[in-house]
Structures are given as C-alpha cells and as structure tokens.
C-alpha cells in the first residue's frame, strides 16, 4: 500500500490521505441527472472517478464506491410532465444510456448506483433531525434550511454569509455563489401532475441537495472518506450537503476529503448549445471519433486543470494511443503466445523503476501528466531495445507486463495478437475513407487512417490515385 497525497478542497492544500479503513476506502461521487444524454463535460467528471478508482486499487487500497442517479429534480419534473410520462418511465431510457456510455469509454462499474427516489425515508429522517435542532422552517408548505443557524456554513466554498438577509430563500436547485440564500429541503407540489410523496414532513418531494446526503447515509450508514464532483458542484450543492449532514448528525464525520474536477472547454470556450459546441459521447462517435481516443483525451490532463477538447487534441490522443499500441504489437509479434493474466512481477531494474515512478505520479494527487511521461519514456526505451535486438523472451514478457500495468489506469490497449487485415478489407476501408473525404467528413476520414496505421498500413496519394503499403 502506497501513501497518497490528495488536494483536499476543504483545506485548500495537499494532505496525506488517511482513510478509516485502507481495505475499504469509501467514495461517493455525484452522478448524472437522467433527463437527457450526459455531455462530454459530465463524462470527464465520470472518468475522473474511474481514474481515482483504478489508482486506489493499483496503489494497494480496497474500494467501496458509489455514484448516485438523480432521478427526481426540477428538470426531470418539467420534462416528464411535458412528455406525459411518469418519472420512472421518463428516466429509465436516460439511465440506460448513462450505463451504455460508461461501457463505451471503458469505465469500471462501481459497487453502488443508488437512485434518489429509493431514498425518500432517509431524506425524511434527515429533515426530522434538522427540525429537532431548529435548523428548518416552513414557508408556503415547503421546508427550508436556515443557513444562518448553522455555524459552519461556507467552510467548503469559503463563502461569507454575514451580509445575507434573514429568511431569503431559493426554491430552485441551482444558484450563484454571489446570491446565497436559504435552500429548500422539501418542496410542496406546484405543478399539475408533479410527482410527490406523502410523508411525516408533509406532501412533496426532495430538494436536490438533500438527495445526496440521504443516499450517502443509505449506502454507508454515516460519512465517507472521499466525496467527488465537478467544480461547479462545490457551491451550492456540496456546501449544502455539508450543512444538512453535519447539521443532522453533528457527532459524525461526513466527508474527510473533497476532490473536485475542473471544467471541460470545447475549442477554448465553455460548452453551450447556443454556441454550437455542445457534444454528447454519441455525437462524437457519430462523427467517427474513436471512444478510446475520447477516453484518453478526457483522462490525460490533471483533474484540477481545465481541459480543452478539440479536433487537434483528439488527433493527438489517437496518435499517442497508436504510439503505445504499436510498441505493444511489436512485442506481441515476437511473443504471440503470451497470456493476458499478468502477475506484475518485475525483475529488470529499469522496468522496476518505471513501475515505481508511475505509482509515485498517481500517488501525488493523481498526477496523470507525470504518469504518462513515464509511459512514453518506457515506450521509447522498449522500441530502442527491440530495434537493436537487445532483449530475450523473458525480458520481452516483462515489457508486455509493464504496459499492461500502465493500462490498468489508461484502459485503452489491446493485448491480443494483431490479426492482419485482408487486402480486400484494406481496399474497402480506403474506399470508405475517400467517400468520407469527398463528403468533408474529415473526422471519419482521420479515424480510418488511424485504424489502418494501427495495422501498419501506410496510405500514399499519387497521380495514379491512392496506393497503400505495409510498413
């Protein structure tokens, strides 16, 4: 087990990670609101959770991880009423699409995916405890949390509530840091056909912030070691989670370490439907982009840094995967009988060094950029050793194993011996590429080129037309 340093948003600095039980690190991550397909900004946050999970396991920790499904909120109610469907009917296909997207980008399945609507009793229990402590008031049949009565409000977002007017409220789930007010815990129904529950705290449905506090309690019984989410959730969502959970259970630790992933930009701008730069994973795949390249790009920048998503960056990600895969394929050609059940026992000193440096990079607040530098340095050295025939079978097997070890985080490599394409298959792909170029579908054209290059096929434009040859 390797010691980890995480940047804790609560303290504003890197800290030694000290879970309650290293063999069962508890992690809660804010998941999708299932009213539409997740966009690629959401996907970056979900893949950050995947890298966190894979890193904890690689560094010797046991994990017990949860990502919630928000299946009741303002947007879901609005759209379900418009579609004349029940909440369950409306959210089911979007929930299914979320899991399909995770599979497409090779995200590992977590231990728990609770739905908000399955945790109503836990929400009611939290409200009742808050009522007993005088932290709740009623207005227009809805229940609100009085933030001025909670002493530690603002400790995560460092917000100052001293200038706030007493009793100013928000019914909406999302609002800006500059306009802090009391937030709603339990909403009375306002619209015809609005989903609601008859409970001991009244007829209504939960506010968004209450849902996560309740689901954490339902899954773990108390708090967690790590809570993650996008930086846009830090306020008000996570701040309000702290207020609810610590207000109801002041004797318990709610969250030890808060990790927040930064925004994703598209061509240097914030993603927006009005700007025409709003993409889902399915949009990108329809354009011919490789899911592996999408995954690689979304995990390749440190989670606390903004990531710019662009066509050039996707092409760069494809090239980087190809660089690693081509090295692996060279070794597999020499060692075709190697099995993919690796034990990761390394005896070569420089391979041991690569392993150690890779682990140390991840243990430093998931420094993926530094980890990737180790990967590419190892690929460079392995290629050099293969070029000069300076390795035997035993050594080559270790090279395969170290690349497999790296791929426990990357999740983009293929360890099966490469099957050569038939000439007819190559001709068919080249014809498809020509059609794509004619239609100005350059994303698909580039994807086919990358596919052929990965198979060692070079394409040449000549006066007589397109020719291809094997490298």
Swiss-Prot record:
Intervals of motif 'HIGH' region: 32-42
Co-factor binding details: Binds 1 zinc ion per subunit.
First-tier enzyme category under EC: ligase
One Pfam family in the UniProt entry: DALR_2
Binding site for ATP: 273
Cellular localisation: Cytoplasm
Main location as per UniProt: cytoplasm
GO biological process: cysteinyl-tRNA aminoacylation
Positions bound to Zn(2+): 30, 212, 237, 241
Chain positions of motif 'KMSKS' region: 270-274
Protein name as catalogued: Cysteine--tRNA ligase
């Amino acid at each position: 087990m390797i010691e980890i340093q995480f940047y804790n948003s609560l303290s504003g600095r890197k800290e030694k990670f000290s879970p309650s039980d290293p063999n069962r690190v508890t992690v809660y991550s804010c998941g999708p609101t299932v009213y539409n397909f997740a966009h690629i900004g959401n996907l970056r946050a979900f893949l950050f959770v995947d890298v966190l999970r894979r890193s904890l396991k690689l560094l010797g920790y046991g994990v017990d991880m949860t990502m919630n499904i928000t299946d009741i909120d303002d947007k879901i109610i609005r759209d379900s009423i418009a579609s004349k469907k029940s909440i369950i009917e409306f959210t089911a296909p979007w929930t299914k699409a979320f899991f399909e997207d995770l599979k497409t980008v090779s995200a590992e399945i977590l231990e728990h995916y609770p739905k908000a609507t399955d945790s109503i009793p836990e929400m009611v229990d939290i409200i009742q405890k808050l009522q007993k402590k005088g932290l709740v008031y009623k207005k227009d049949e809805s229940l609100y949390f009085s933030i001025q009565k909670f002493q530690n409000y603002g400790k995560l977002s460092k917000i100052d509530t001293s200038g706030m007017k007493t009793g100013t409220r928000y019914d909406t789930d999302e609002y800006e840091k500059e306009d802090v007010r009391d937030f709603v815990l339990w909403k009375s129904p306002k619209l015809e056909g609005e989903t609601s529950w008859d409970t001991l705290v009244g007829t209504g449905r939960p506010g968004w912030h209450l849902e996560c506090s309740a689901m954490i309690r339902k899954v773990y019984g108390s708090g967690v070691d790590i809570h993650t989410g996008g930086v846009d959730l830090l306020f008000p969502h996570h701040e309000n989670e702290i207020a609810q959970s610590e207000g109801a259970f002041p004797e318990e630790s709610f969250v030890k370490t808060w990790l927040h992933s930064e925004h994703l930009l598209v061509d240097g701008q914030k993603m927006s439907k009005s700007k025409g730069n709003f993409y889902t994973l399915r949009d990108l795949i329809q354009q011919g982009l490789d899911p592996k390249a999408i995954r690689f790009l979304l995990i390749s920048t440190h989670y606390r840094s903004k990531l710019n998503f662009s066509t050039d960056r996707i092409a760069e990600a494809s090239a980087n995967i190809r660089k690693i895969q081509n090295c692996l394929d060279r070794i597999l050609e020499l060692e075709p009988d190697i099995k993919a059940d690796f034990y990761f026992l390394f005896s070569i000193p420089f391979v041991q060094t690569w392993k150690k440096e890779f682990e140390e990079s991840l243990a430093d607040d998931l420094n993926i950029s530094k980890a990737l530098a180790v990967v590419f340095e190892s690929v460079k050295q392995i290629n050099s050793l293969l070029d000069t025939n300076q390795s035997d079978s035993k050594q080559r097997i270790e090279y395969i194993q170290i690349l497999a070890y790296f791929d426990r985080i990357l999740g983009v490599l293929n360890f099966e011996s490469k099957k050569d394409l038939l000439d007819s298959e190559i001709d068919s792909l080249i014809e498809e590429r020509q059609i794509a170029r004619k239609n100005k579908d350059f994303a698909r054209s580039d994807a086919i080129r990358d596919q052929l290059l990965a198979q060692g096929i070079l394409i040449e434009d000549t006066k007589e037309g397109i020719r291809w040859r094997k490298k």
